[in-house]
Every structure is written in C-alpha cells, then in structure tokens.
C-alpha cells in the first residue's frame, strides 16, 4: 500500500523504471552531441560549455591514466565549488576511478582519517589547502598531490586583481613540492591524448561521500554511476512541472563534497541539460545573493540557516538585491520553519519545498509536493520508485500503521541507495538490511503518505522514564519572538537520568532570560519537556551545510562537568 502515489502533483510519473543503462558521463555527452555550446557551468562570470567540460575532463582523465591511476582507484577531491571540482570529478570517472569528495575545511585529524578511510593515492586540492594535505600525507597512502588555484577559471581582470590583492593573503600563493604537479599542467599534457578508452559501466563505483559528522568520525559511503543517474532523474521528474530541459540555472552554493549537491543538484542539472552556477563559499551570503541576481538563477537548493541569513541581510531588508529570477527552492539538512518558508516565498515569488535524504541514500528519498498540500512539519512523501515504511523500534520486521501515535524508525527501499560503506561490512550491515536502509530517524506516516520526523533515534531524552523529543522542544522555542536559533539535548542528571537543556541564539537587538524562555515553554509543553537549563550563546556549532551539531554542544557540556 503506497498512499503517497495518490497525492503526487498532477502529471508526475509514479515510476521511472526501467532506468536507462547510463552513466553521468553518457548523460553529459548526449548534451555535447545535441547542443555542444549549452552552458554547463558559470563561475564568477566565466561560462564553460558542455563541450568544453567534456574536453577538459578528457584531458584530466588522460593525465591521471598516464600517472598510473587505474580503474577502481580512489582520487580525493579536496576543494570547494570551483570549476576544477567538476572537471576533475568527470575526469576521475572517465579514467575509471572513484571520486572521493572531502571537505577542505576538515581539520588535519579529520582529513587524515578521510584519506585513510577511502585509501586514496591521489589528491586534487585547492592551493590554500595544499599545506594541510602535505602535513598529513605521510600518515596516509597519498603518493601524489595535484594543486589547483581558485583563480584559474576567473575572468581575466578578476584573475589579475586576485593575483595582486588576494592570492598571498588568502594562502593561495604556494610553492609545490617535488613530485606534485599543477592541475593546469596536467590539463595541457592530457589534452593531446584524445578520448579516454577506459570502459566505464553504470554498475561501477563512481563516488565516495563522507557522512556528515553528526555522530562522530565520518564513514565513506559508496555510490555507483547508475546511482547518480537515477537520483538525477528522480529529482528532475519531481520538479518537471516547473523545471524545463535546457532552460534552468541551478544555483550551486551547497558544497559539492556533500550529498545534497554531488548526488542531487549536479546529477539533476545534467539530466535536465541545465546549467550549474558555482558559488565557492555558501557562508558568503552577499555573494550568494549577488550571484543569483547576476546569473538569473532559477533553482535554489539551500538550507534553513541560509534562508534565514538572507532574509535578515541588509541587501534584502533595504531592497538592494533582486532575487525574482528564482522560481523554485528546495530546503534540506534540517527542519524549515513555516515563518521562514512564507517570508522567503513572498520575497522571491517562488515556491519552497522540503526534501529529506541521507548520505547513505545517495540523495532522493522524500520531498514535499510543489503544487499539492503543504503539511507543516512534514518532510513530504517518497519520490518515484522510493518506498518508506515505519518500523517498530522493538521489532524492526514489523511495520507500524498510519498516525502520529505510531512512531517508529523510518526505513527506506530505493534503487539508488549506497552500495555500502567502503570496506566496513559491519557498519554496512547495521544500516542496510535485506536491501532496506535503516535511517536512525524516528517518525510516522499519515494516511496520505506524508512523513513526519520526530527525532533521531539516538537523541531521545529520557526524563524520569518519559521520552522527550528534542525537535518538539526546538519547534516551540523557535516560536519565541526573541529566538533566532536553538538546539535542545539531554544532559546527565542524577535525579531524573537526563535533564532537558536548551542552547539559544537571540535575534539581534532582542533580549530574554532563562525564566522568560521556560515560562513560554510551559504554555505549550508538558512540564517534563520544559528545558530545565537554558544557555544563551552568540552562535551554535554547525556542519558545512548548516546543520546544528547537537553532539558538539553535549560534548562541551560534558567537559564543563569534569
């Protein structure tokens, strides 16, 4: 029984099967054949066509092969959103290798762990992170490092100004060590090699993405070439009443080392034969907004913290930026407040939908409909060819009936799930059982097939035998007019096992006391759910896509108690 199928937007396909036996390389090259000068990427005023992307990635693939990179080898990509990331990734794929996408902002400890986790022997790195990679190289299997400068694909004048004014200050002026080779030198060398001849199958491994770090050191989730094509088709199909082939400009500010962008935005852009506009730093809110204005971006995948930051920025409050080109937004990573949704939709005359995915799902799982009913607090319904059931937490072979009283673990069946964690069969077996992905998220499904997340299985707070869902408390706190951001977790308590604690960032110019917050919560929550402790902060620790790291707050609290 799949009640969600009856609530899809009109005209959307209920299934996309059978999926074509293709790779994203094939998809890209179909556009090269049909419209070679269609723009594939825009970066700071530079446009790169599908044909040019094909040529550059061929050149890089040839260079990798000549360096000894073999089919199945892992090549680490340690870069933000710059054209070299996309060129290198397609080049890695054409060489038959696996792209291991690593957050360049990792600490040296985290970076060494990621490199060792995937076993990469080659790393492509932006110059300002070169020293970091070199510092940990001896702790890893990395044999060769390929540096690339952020300025390489800037327009001529901007490149000159960057060289004169910013290159040294930003840490991008480097001397490379013996044995390492510049990215552009490899492009020149490989450009004389023609079309790579390595045979790449849809079932070959294409991608390693690292889990988000909300539960400790990251694990390496593996996706195939077919995974990416399926994900791209699912996303494009869900939005096909708005997105049109060849026409749309995907604002890509979310980092390409993250599942949202790499297994979601990028495949959907190529499947739709659209354009990706790259923004290297999603935290640079003025740059994000000015890029939307200049490039007339139409599709804006984002996260709640970015929507909030834009709404309160002077460029918006003083009407100094035009965001009217946006016709569709998708929000992920954390819950989107209804107030934020309504204000941003009013600002842009666009529609915001919410999506739900995990690194392990390799993107598309659930999404709210574009035209159908919006249900506050819901992550939407399964997209085409995805099935979701709510499993009993005591016996996960049993599925729970519909309704808010039947909370269980969200379990997914889908054709695009990860193959597993790289060389971690035990961890894989915990997540993947008989072809189903056990998410660790608790929630319920209503009779229309809409799914509601209650909380993470591991984050439930136990107060005197009662269960408290942090998200429920956070949703109440977020309604307080003085609260900008908040997070809730359980801290040890000798009397009640755990106590509820809230960490709060106040809106600029607003004030509140712990007593104010507690009184507000008592009006809406049962007594044991009201935060016993309230801490005001200037900011909350977040992941690279703006997800609040509850674990870090709990860790800080534990350190205070010792």
Predicted regions and their residues:
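ANL superfamily adenylate-forming
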Residues: 6, 134-202, 314
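Conserved AMP-binding/adenylate-forming core of the ANL superfamily
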Residues: 18-20, 37-82, 86-90, 107-112
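Conserved adenylate-forming
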Residues: 67-69, 190-203, 208-252, 274, ...
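AMP-binding/adenylate-forming catalytic core of the ANL superfamily
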Residues: 125, 300, 414, 419-420, ...
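Gly/Ser/Thr-rich phosphate-binding loop
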Residues: 147, 294-302, 315-374, 387
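Conserved AMP-binding/adenylation subdomain of ANL enzymes
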Residues: 229-249, 259-298, 313
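Conserved ATP/PPi-binding loop(s) of AMP-dependent carboxylate-activating enzymes
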Residues: 381-385, 396-431, 468
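Conserved beta-loop-beta connector loops within the AMP-binding
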Residues: 389-411, 447-448, 510-514, 549
């Amino acid at each position: 029984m799949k009640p969600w199928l009856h609530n899809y937007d009109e005209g959307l396909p209920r299934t996309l099967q059978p999926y074509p036996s293709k790779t994203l390389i094939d998809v890209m090259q179909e556009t090269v054949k049909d419209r070679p000068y269609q723009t594939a990427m825009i970066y700071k005023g530079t446009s790169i066509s599908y044909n040019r992307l094909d040529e550059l990635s061929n050149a890089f693939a040839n260079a990798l092969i000549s360096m000894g990179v073999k089919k199945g080898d892992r090549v680490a990509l340690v870069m933000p959103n710059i054209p070299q990331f996309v060129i290198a990734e397609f080049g890695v794929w054409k060489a038959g290798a696996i792209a291991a996408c690593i957050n360049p902002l990792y600490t040296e400890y985290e970076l060494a762990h990621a490199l060792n986790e995937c076993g990469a022997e080659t790393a492509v790195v932006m110059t300002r992170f070169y020293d970091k990679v070199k510092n940990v190289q001896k702790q890893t299997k990395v044999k060769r490092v390929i540096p690339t400068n952020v300025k390489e694909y800037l327009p001529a004048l901007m490149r000159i100004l960057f060289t004169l004014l910013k290159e040294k200050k930003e840490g991008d002026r480097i001397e490379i060590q013996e044995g390492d080779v510049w990215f552009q030198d490899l492009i020149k060398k490989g450009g004389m090699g023609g079309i790579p001849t390595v045979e790449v199958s849809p079932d070959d491994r294409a991608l390693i993405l690292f889990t988000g770090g909300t539960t400790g050191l990251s694990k390496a989730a593996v996706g195939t070439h077919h995974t990416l094509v399926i994900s791209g088709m699912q996303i494009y199909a869900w939005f096909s009443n708005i997105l049109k082939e060849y026409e749309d400009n995907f604002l890509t500010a979310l980092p390409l080392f993250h599942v949202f962008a790499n297994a979601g935005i990028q495949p959907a852009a190529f499947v739709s034969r659209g354009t990706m506009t790259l923004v290297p730093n999603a935290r640079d809110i003025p740059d994000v907004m000015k890029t939307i204005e200049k490039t007339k971006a139409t599709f804006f995948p984002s996260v709640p913290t970015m929507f909030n930051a834009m709404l309160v920025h002077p460029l918006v409050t003083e009407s100094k930026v035009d965001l009217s080109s946006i016709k569709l937004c998708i929000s992920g990573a954390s819950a989107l407040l209804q107030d934020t949704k309504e204000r941003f939709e009013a600002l842009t005359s666009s529609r915001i939908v919410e999506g739900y995915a995990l690194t392990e799902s390799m993107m598309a799982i659930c999404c709210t409909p574009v035209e159908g009913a919006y249900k506050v607090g819901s992550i939407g319904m399964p997209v085409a060819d995805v099935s979701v059931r709510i499993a009993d937490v005591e016996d996960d072979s049993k599925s729970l009936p519909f309704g808010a009283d039947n909370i269980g673990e969200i379990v997914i069946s889908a054709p695009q799930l990860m193959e597993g964690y790289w060389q971690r069969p035990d961890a894989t077996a915990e997540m993947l059982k008989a072809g189903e992905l056990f998410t660790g998220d608790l929630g319920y499904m209503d009779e229309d097939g809409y799914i509601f997340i209650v909380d993470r299985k591991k984050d439930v707070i136990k107060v005197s035998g009662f269960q408290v869902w942090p998200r429920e408390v956070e949703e109440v706190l977020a309604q307080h007019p003085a609260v900008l951001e908040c997070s809730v977790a359980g801290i040890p308590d000798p009397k009640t096992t755990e106590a509820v604690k809230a960490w709060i960032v106040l809106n600029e110019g607003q004030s509140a006391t712990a007593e104010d917050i507690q009184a507000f919560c008592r009006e809406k929550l049962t007594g044991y759910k009201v935060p016993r402790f309230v801490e005001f902060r200037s900011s909350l620790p977040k992941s690279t896509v703006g997800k609040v790291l509850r674990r870090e707050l709990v860790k800080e609290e534990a350190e205070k108690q010792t």
